[in-house]
């Protein structure tokens, strides 16, 4: 893990260059360009608002804002994991022609989507203020939650990217699992809607994204401190998972260029 972090720092210029390149290329040639950073989550929100408030008649106060608070970090997570799984196998040109630090590829995917997440935050804050929900001092813990999500997302992405080099079906499996994972995470509904306390505890234990989503909702929607115990447990698990992911990555590093 130390070697991986050291090499990421050593090749930080390359990482920044890849992130900038991806951000510029993502909407190049489109008429609206950079505006899609805001339009994508907004269109997602409108579809779910229509479904849950008109069709299913959910009665959650300020539902569009509630959903947006969870939707933005979920989009960051899902696009990072979905795109990161194939980050190495899709860049055979780089790995076979030059001595290239493979860990930069999945990292650049995660960081690129993190940038999109951060750029979308003003839209979320404006939406909240439109509903009379102004940010409170609890936002000081927002960077902590983001750091925990970043650690967990990087760990999962490294593992998937390493495995996908030899098992290409994984990227398609991940894409479908993310859809199921989304509905098993309280993004479109509060965790409190699950009446059974044992079921809620099981969700917190088995689904790492639950504590992240409820933490964002606590900070921006409920204006309170996140529940410390599940969040700190996830932080510890994420660090251990990142260590394991870096070990897997190191053990397979030499195989990447040969396998793809």
UniProtKB/Swiss-Prot annotation:
Q: Which organism is it from?
A: Myxococcus xanthus
Q: What is this protein called?
A: O-antigen export system permease protein RfbA
| Gene (UniProt) | rfbA
**Ranges annotated as spanning the membrane:** 31-51, 63-83, 109-129, 139-159, 173-193, 201-221, 229-249
Q: One Pfam family of this protein, by short name?
A: ABC2_membrane
Q: List, alphabetically, the GO terms of the cellular component aspect.
A: plasma membrane
Q: What is its main location?
A: membrane
Q: Which UniProt keywords apply?
A: Cell inner membrane, Cell membrane, Membrane, Polysaccharide transport, Sugar transport, Transmembrane, Transmembrane helix, Transport
Q: Which family does it belong to?
A: Belongs to the ABC-2 integral membrane protein family.
For this UniProt entry, the molecular function terms from Gene Ontology, in alphabetical order, are: ABC-type transporter activity
- Keyword Disulfide bond attached: no
InterPro entries named in the record: ABC2_TM, ABC2_TM_bact-type
Q: Name one GO biological process term.
A: lipopolysaccharide transport
Q: How does it sit in the membrane?
A: Multi-pass membrane protein
**Which classification does the entry list for the species?**
Bacteria, Pseudomonadati, Myxococcota, Myxococcia, Myxococcales
């Amino acid at each position: 893990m130390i070697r991986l972090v050291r090499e990421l720092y050593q090749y930080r210029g390359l990482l920044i260059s890849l992130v900038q390149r991806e951000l510029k290329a993502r909407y190049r040639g489109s008429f609206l360009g950079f505006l899609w950073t805001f339009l994508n989550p907004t269109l997602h929100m409108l579809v779910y608002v229509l479904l849950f408030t008109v069709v299913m008649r959910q009665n959650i106060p300020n539902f569009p804002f509630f959903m947006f608070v969870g939707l933005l970090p979920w989009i960051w997570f899902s696009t990072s994991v979905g795109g990161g799984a194939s980050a190495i196998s899709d860049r055979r040109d780089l790995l076979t022609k030059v001595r290239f630090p493979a860990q930069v590829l999945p990292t650049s995917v995660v960081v690129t989507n993190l940038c999109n997440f951060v750029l979308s935050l003003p839209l979320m804050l404006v939406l909240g203020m439109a509903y009379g929900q102004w940010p409170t001092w609890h936002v000081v813990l927002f960077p902590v939650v983001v750091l925990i999500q970043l650690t967990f997302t990087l760990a999962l992405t490294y593992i998937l990217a390493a495995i996908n080099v030899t098992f290409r079906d994984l990227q398609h499996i991940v894409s479908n699992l993310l859809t199921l994972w989304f509905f098993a995470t309280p993004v479109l509904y509060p965790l409190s809607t699950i009446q059974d306390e044992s079921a809620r505890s099981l969700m917190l234990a088995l689904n790492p994204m639950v504590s992240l989503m409820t933490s964002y909702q606590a900070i921006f929607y409920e204006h309170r401190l996140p529940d410390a115990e599940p969040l700190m447990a996830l932080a510890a698990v994420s660090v251990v998972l990142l260590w394991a992911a870096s070990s897997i990555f190191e053990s397979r590093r030499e195989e990447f260029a040969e396998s793809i």
